[in-house]
Swiss-Prot record:
Low complexity composition bias: residue spans: 184-214
Gene: RSR1
Subcellular location: Cell membrane
Recorded GO CC terms: cell division site; cellular bud neck; incipient cellular bud site; plasma membrane; vacuolar membrane
Name this protein carries in UniProt: Ras-related protein RSR1
Organism whose genome encodes this protein: Candida albicans (Yeast)
Length: 248
């Protein structure tokens, strides 16, 4: 079973705790109590794989922003939540997303954009199109309008971010495997080149040895011929025509 840490981010009062508790416990929490930090765990199955989720429900108020960076560092996936009844809550997400990308030092971070409180149609100030536009501006980040009260798209939003985490891990694993195979091939090629070089050196050594032996034989024969010639010069032909040849 794989462990995944999901961080829920957003302005205060947008319903981060409500959708988290609804997802984990199946209960709607109506009262608003500003959260410092709550941690929840839930085991789910995504695409046939068992996952143990740790969900961090973070504070939305300004005095807890220092803690937020720690949550972002440890998180693998993020739900960025705004309220469709609060235009400023969507604007705050722009800065939050930039903070996530900066801390994670990546443009490829598992992330879902969530427009909560879609059941409050009479209080709505942000349309679905507003959320879609932000999603497009962020590179087609998955976007869901949710209702914590009616559990509309709550499970879908969490499962989506988990699925993104799984895909990213699979891609990283495949890349590492490919790099390992490439290194193995390079090592084999280097070993083959080294072996070929040694064979060439051995052949070159044998050729030099053979040439040296030939040179030594030729030098020996030259020396014998020189001695023979000297001996003939030292003992000229006799009057009877006999030859005296002394080979030393």
């Amino acid at each position: 079973m794989r462990d995944y840490k999901v961080v829920v981010l957003g302005a205060g009062g947008v319903g981060k705790s409500s959708i988290t508790v609804q997802f984990v416990q199946g209960v709607y929490v109506e009262s608003y109590d500003p959260t410092i930090e709550d941690s929840y765990r839930k085991q789910i199955e995504v695409d046939g794989r068992a996952c143990d989720l740790e969900i961090l429900d973070t504070a939305g108020v300004a005095q807890f922003t220092a803690m937020r960076e720690l949550y972002i560092k440890s998180g693998k996936g993020f739900l960025l939540v705004y309220s469709v009844t609060d235009e400023n809550s969507l604007k705050e997400l722009l800065a939050l997303r930039e903070q996530v990308l900066r801390i994670k030092d990546s443009d490829n971070v598992p992330m879902v954009l969530v427009g909560n409180k879609c059941d409050l149609e009479d209080d709505r100030v942000l349309s679905i199109e507003d959320g879609v536009k932000v999603s497009q501006d962020w590179g087609l980040v998955p976007f869901y309008e949710t209702s914590a009260m009616y559990k509309t798209n709550v499970d879908e939003a969490f499962i989506d971010v988990v699925r993104q985490i799984m895909r990213k891990e699979a891609a990283i694993s495949a890349e590492k495997k490919q790099q390992k195979e490439l290194q193995k091939q390079q090592q084999q090629q280097q070993q083959e080149q080294d072996a070929e070089g040694q064979q060439q050196q051995q052949k070159s050594g044998k050729s030099k040895s053979s040439a040296t032996q030939k040179d030594a034989t030729a030098d020996g024969q030259t020396d014998v011929n020189a001695r023979l010639k000297q001996s003939i010069n030292d003992h000229p032909k006799s009057s009877s025509g006999s030859k005296f040849c002394t080979i030393i």
